[in-house]
């Protein structure tokens, strides 16, 4: 289902009223969100929507951050970090975790290169979220469950790293940290065989089934909003 801007605003207002957010304080609560964007060459290919996947991903990430910076709960409690990954390594586009409203003013450049180290990127993202949560706790701030949002076409080039054990090790890390970190995967198309090694199928969605990546990120934004209020 694709939402119009008006529908998104109305849905957010309904959530505010039904969940009674006006009576909830987020001053002493923080939720880290790390967005990992695949920037391998294959992401330069056109999606079913007719434009390069990497451009669709960029628009979607901007939409997500814009929502977080305007949503009453998320703008106060969410710190966001955007990283890209390819054969050149992992690039931190936000310079670490920053308030959503600050990230909304940033301009991101997703430069593509060979290879797609998906498992390495997720491993790094989990460590980053945990480190951010530890920082909250040291500052006497309530550290809520963080999110790792993976955007990819599902083609991992580091699958056989460490004698084929990298997927096992990363999934084990996610399992051990499931109370602290949630992983969700947005995939261009149905090439999810390798992603299945990371998480359960219900955490993997084909973004092209949502009548456009905007609709996927709208759904994701609403999920974050509900999570922030349900804590």
Stretch-by-stretch model annotation:
Residues 1-34, 40-50, 133-138:
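Acidic, polar low-complexity linker/tail segments
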